[in-house]
Amino acid sequence: MSEIVSVSGGPTKPEIIAVSLSKLGLKDGDRFADVGCGTGSVSIEAARIARNLTIYAIDARKEALLATETNFKNFGIENARILAGEASDILGSEKTIDSIDCAFVGGTKNIGSILAKLVEKKARSIVVNAVRIETVVRTIEAMKSLDIFDEVIHVAVSRSFPIAGETMFKPENPVYIVVGKKQS
């Protein structure tokens, strides 16, 4: 099994990916945007859940794009486009991406604009991961203004490690998972 090539700030922890993807409700054949893709680890797991997924991995950081490209190659992810630039610009172009079914947002720069573009692209579900309270508040406000806010989940994971012949837990940084769903 290949190891994920990492970048600063990533990859997203497996437990966070599991909860985030469960909230997305991916279906076979979906068009999936991974905004602020980092290492591409969320896309890799998404591809394991839904067959024939079309992936749009978006990031402005060169190191992230290179890591994603390497990880996609190592994990056999073929039906993916890696897109360089600001997500709000890329999502705003009809030529680049015509529609999106589900989106994971790991990078939260310009979150209001990104969410608006995803709604324009007809995304039925959007999940945003955030670690800062201010980002959570901005995300909730933006989702409410777009009439897509569903819920926020606070996830705190601790990992065991040995100490003095016994086991202790060390907490990871908590993550807020903000969920938006298209209202029927």
From Swiss-Prot:
One record GO biological process: anaerobic cobalamin biosynthetic process
Catalysed reaction, written as an equation: Co-precorrin-6B + S-adenosyl-L-methionine = Co-precorrin-7 + S-adenosyl-L-homocysteine + CO2
Pathway: Cofactor biosynthesis; adenosylcobalamin biosynthesis; cob(II)yrinate a,c-diamide from sirohydrochlorin (anaerobic route): step 8/10
EC number: 2.1.1.196
Any GO MF annotation of the entry: protein methyltransferase activity
InterPro entries, per database record: CbiT (IPR023475), Cbl_synth_MTase_CbiT (IPR014008), Cobalamin_biosynth_MTase (IPR050714), Methyltranfer_dom (IPR025714), SAM-dependent_MTases_sf (IPR029063)
Superkingdom to which the source organism belongs: Archaea
Residues holding S-adenosyl-L-methionine: 12, 36-40, 59, 87
UniProt keyword annotation of Transferase present: yes
Keyword Kinase carried by entry: no
TM spans (from-to): none
UniProt cross-references to SUPFAM superfamilies, sorted A to Z: S-adenosyl-L-methionine-dependent methyltransferases
Keywords annotated in UniProt: Cobalamin biosynthesis, Methyltransferase, S-adenosyl-L-methionine, Transferase
Family: Belongs to the methyltransferase superfamily. Archaeal-type CbiT family.
UniProt name for this protein: Probable cobalt-precorrin-6B C(15)-methyltransferase (decarboxylating)
Taxonomic source organism: Methanosarcina mazei (strain ATCC BAA-159 / DSM 3647 / Goe1 / Go1 / JCM 11833 / OCM 88) (Methanosarcina frisia)
